[in-house]
Structures are given as structure tokens and as C-alpha cells.
Amino acid sequence: MSLAKASLWTAASTLVKIGAGLLVGKLLAVSFGPAGLGLAANFRQLITVLGVLAGAGIFNGVTKYVAQYHDNPQQLRRVVGTSSAMVLGFSTLMALVFVLAAAPISQGLFGNTDYQGLVRLVALVQMGIAWGNLLLALMKGFRDAAGNALSLIVGSLIGVLAYYVSYRLGGYEGALLGLALIPALVVIPAAIMLIKRGVIPLSYLKPSWDNGLAGQLSKFTLMALITSVTLPVAYIMMRKLLAAQYSWDEVGIWQGVSSISDAYLQFITASFSVYLLPTLSRLTEKRDITREVVKSLKFVLPAVAAASFTVWLLRDFAIWLLLSNKFTAMRDLFAWQLVGDVLKVGAYVFGYLVIAKASLRFYILAEVSQFTLLMVFAHWLIPAHGALGAAQAYMATYIVYFSLCCGVFLLWRRRA
């Protein structure tokens, strides 16, 4: 399956995911205003981190090795069994941490300990996120874009219903819990789809252990841990800096443009893990890898640029439709944010090459570079320009980072 075909399949699921996310954002914005949306931003960041980290964060590794061993049943069984064991063990450990450390987690996210009950509920919900992500990773390894898309579509619809029920029953805390339920409930249709496809026997999912594979997958766990303490922490620190220098309303304004940005970018990036990761995992020759990377960039950069320009033209309509008139101040942030988006997605192509080759050294360097750049530009621009400065820091970070990625790739390509 080509990148374009994978993109078409994932576009349908992404459209539903975007619709779900924007509907949730609209409810939060209308019900709780910029301050409520701003305060929820750190919790949404936690959900994003759990999407990466829950279940040992091995999902890119699962996709890589399933793609690599898809025609070797004995090795494939080891991959799936070891992955199941790691997901079960790590998600259980995460649940214990959330239950026992509910107070400091609440303090770190919200600035008080009033949300301990919510944190303890998330301890259970993240187990659903972990298993759902494992099943999706298996389908991605087989490059089953259709199965992956259908699972996400049905899961998103179930999740929105669960969100609305939680919101009606629990108010603001219920709405926050609903944010976590949306990705967690994908596990239901994903399990049904995997059974229906029959690509692997269910017995393969029985937890087992292979030391060699566990060691290889642990590289991806370390990558996930690094991811969870770099960019998410950087964004939390940026929000706290913005709130301290200005207000939570300013945080909400920046979060508003970020949420719109995240939504439309899913159309482009959703196909990466379905097509790009397994494809790059199978390639071994530099010439073939270079051809695939260049082809992907030629597709991705114009697509994101066109989408970004469209969003910029429709920014006033987007604010009215997706948020409320309380967010009109964010119209000045779009140009800065959207330029950063184009270059960020371009850098993602190089990032997936690093993941496909399980290059831990380059992965750490990439994450630390982004964290450092964000912090440097944020501490310079946020005090001077508020929410606008946050968007400017984002753009400046990815101008520099994309340039670095291109330079490193050219050096790697020229090495013998």
C-alpha cells in the first residue's frame, strides 16, 4: 500500500477523530471559557503522554518488529507474546503509581490537590489506552490501514458518547475524565477488528517472554520515557510561565490555536505510523531509504503548507465554529503557529526514520534538542509577548529543528 492510499484510509478515521476532538474542545470552551480550557491543557497533555507511555511505550517497536517478521510465524509469536507481557506489567505498574501518587500528580497538573479522585480513575483508564494501542500497533505492523481506521472511527464515536455522559454527570471533573475515556475505549473495536481480520491467532496474545526481544523493545520504552519528560514537560512549563506572567486566560488563548493546529495536522501525520514506519523498517539500503524519505517530504510539505494556508484563511470562522467569541484574540497567533506546523511535520519524517532504525542515540538527541529550543525561545518571547510569544517560540523552535534534521540527514547519507 502506498503512502497516498494509506493517507486516504486514515483520512476517514482522522476526520472522525478530529470531529470528536473539536466537539470536546467546543464543549470545554463554551462551558468553562479560556481559563477552563487552559487549566485542562495540562491534563490533556497527560493523556497524550499516556498514549505514548502506557503499556511500556513499545508500540512503535511492536509495529516495527511485526512488519519485520510478518512472514515468520515463530518469531512473530515471540514478538506478540513478549509485547503482551510488557504491556500487562507496565500498565499495572503505572496504575499503582497513579493511585499512590495521586496527590503530587494533581498538584503538578492543576496547582492543587483537589483532583486526586480523577487521577485515581485515570489509573484504571490508562490500562485501556495501553491495550488499545497494542492492538492498533499490531494492525499497523501488517499495514492494515483499513482495519486501523475502522477501529479508530468506532472507538472515537463510543468515546464521544462516554465523554458526554461523564460531562453531564460530573461537570468539569467529569469532562476531564471523558478526555481519557476517548482513547481508552478504542480497545473495544480494535479487539473485534483484530479477531475478524485473523492475521494472528488469539493465542499469540498470551503473555510470554523472550529476553532478546524484550531487550530490543526496551529501547522503545526508553524512547517513550524520554518523550514523556521532554516535550510534554516543556509545554507544561511554558503554560505555567505564561500563567505566571499573564493569566490562565492567556494560556487558554494559546491552547485554542494549538488545539486547532493539532486537529488538522492529524490528517497528515496519521498515515505515518501506518505506512512510513513499517516501510522504513523493511528498507536496509541507504539509497532506498533516501528515496523513501525524499518522496515522503515531497508529499508531506506541500500538503501541510496547503492545509495551513487554508486554516489561516478560515481562522475567524474556525474560532467562531470551534471555540467561542471569547477566543478572538487568538487570531493573531495563527500565522506563527502554522509556519511552525509545516516544519514540525517535515521533521516528523526524519523522526520516523530514527524510530524505524531504533537509533536510541539520535532519538535522545532529537528530543533534547526540541526541549532545549522550546525552553530558550519561550523564556525569551513569552515574557515579552504573552500568548503570541508562545506561538512565536513554537515557530522559531521548528525552523531551527527542521534545519538541523536536514543537515544531519545529509551527513548520514554521505557517510560510507
From Swiss-Prot:
An example Gene Ontology molecular-function term: intramembrane lipid transporter activity
TM stretches of this protein: 18-38, 46-66, 85-105, 122-142, 145-165, 175-195, 217-237, 260-280, 303-323, 335-355, 371-391, 392-412
Pathway note: Bacterial outer membrane biogenesis; enterobacterial common antigen biosynthesis
PANTHER family: LIPID III FLIPPASE (PTHR30250:SF30), PST FAMILY PREDICTED COLANIC ACID TRANSPORTER (PTHR30250)
Periplasmic side, ranges: 39-45, 106-121, 166-174, 238-259, 324-334
Gene null: resulting phenotype: Null mutation results in the accumulation of lipid III and cell death.
One Gene Ontology biological process: enterobacterial common antigen biosynthetic process
Subunit structure: Probably part of a complex composed of WzxE, WzyE and WzzE.
This protein's name: Lipid III flippase
InterPro entries: Poly_Biosynth_Transport (IPR050833), Polysacc_synth (IPR002797), WzxE (IPR044550), WzxE_Proteobacteria (IPR032896)
NCBIfam families linked: PRK15099.1
Gene: wzxE
